[in-house]
């Protein structure tokens, strides 16, 4: 049985968010194919996540023991490390993703939990795990230097040791004349197909 962490980073509501229409379809199909797996949904806008403050540094760099697992910040890092698979649903905002997702990543990027420092340099601790990033974008950004959200996620997840990463991108949603519903449906089809083997 696998533990799946479904990370949602969009201020829009369920029925409004084009990203969530695709990611929720992915999750539903995944459940059908993996009924025994545990799926934990983490809606970042409903969590008590904020930008790190000076007082938080002691918690991040303090001891990593049983007591620290209840720490208001470290609990996210432990939860992230405990998962086997990750579904990250976040739209492109201003060439990246919503700031709350970066704030969350700062919570989970903790030495001794998701990676460690060695004499040879940092080493990821989350090997043999997999992730999918589901993103809706207003324009076409495949292989574009302007696309920094997916590239950053691939880099930071790789830093944690997660190398098996897929992306489902729904592009050109804000281009005049584009059939948005059709684009979203194409994204849902891709999501359903990938969910069957994720």
Curated annotation (Swiss-Prot):
GO terms for molecular function: electron transfer activity; FMN binding; oxidoreductase activity, acting on NAD(P)H as acceptor; oxidoreductase activity, acting on NAD(P)H, quinone or similar compound as acceptor. Coiled coil: none annotated. FMN binds at residues 92-95, 136-139. It comes from the Bacteria. Pfam families: Flavodoxin_2. Its cofactor is FMN. Its EC number is 1.6.5.-, 1.7.1.17. It catalyses: 2 a quinone + NADH + H(+) = 2 a 1,4-benzosemiquinone + NAD(+); N,N-dimethyl-1,4-phenylenediamine + anthranilate + 2 NAD(+) = 2-(4-dimethylaminophenyl)diazenylbenzoate + 2 NADH + 2 H(+). Keywords: Flavoprotein, FMN, NAD, Oxidoreductase. Binds 1 FMN per subunit. Quinone reductase that provides resistance to thiol-specific stress caused by electrophilic quinones. Homodimer. Belongs to the azoreductase type 1 family. This is FMN-dependent NADH:quinone oxidoreductase. It comes from Clostridium perfringens (strain ATCC 13124 / DSM 756 / JCM 1290 / NCIMB 6125 / NCTC 8237 / Type A).
């Amino acid at each position: 049985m696998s533990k799946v962490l479904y990370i949602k980073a969009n201020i829009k509501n369920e029925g409004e968010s084009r990203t969530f229409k695709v990611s929720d379809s992915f999750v539903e199909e995944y459940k059908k194919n993996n009924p025994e797996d545990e799926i934990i949904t983490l809606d970042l806008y409903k969590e008590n996540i904020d930008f790190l403050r000076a007082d938080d540094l002691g918690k991040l760099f303090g001891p990593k023991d049983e007591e620290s697992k209840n720490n208001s910040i470290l609990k996210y890092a432990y939860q992230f490390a405990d998962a086997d698979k990750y579904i990250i649903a976040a739209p492109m905002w201003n060439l990246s993703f919503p700031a709350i997702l970066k704030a969350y990543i700062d919570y989970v990027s903790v030495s001794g939990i998701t990676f460690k420092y060695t004499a040879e340099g940092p080493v990821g601790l989350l090997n043999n795990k997999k992730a999918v990033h589901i993103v809706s974008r207003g324009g076409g950004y495949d292989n574009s230097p302007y696309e920094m959200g997916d590239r950053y996620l691939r880099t930071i997840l790789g830093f944690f040791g997660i190398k098996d990463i897929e992306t489902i991108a729904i592009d050109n949603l804000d281009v005049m004349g584009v059939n948005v519903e059709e684009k979203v449906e194409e994204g849902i089809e891709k999501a359903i197909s990938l969910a069957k083997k994720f």
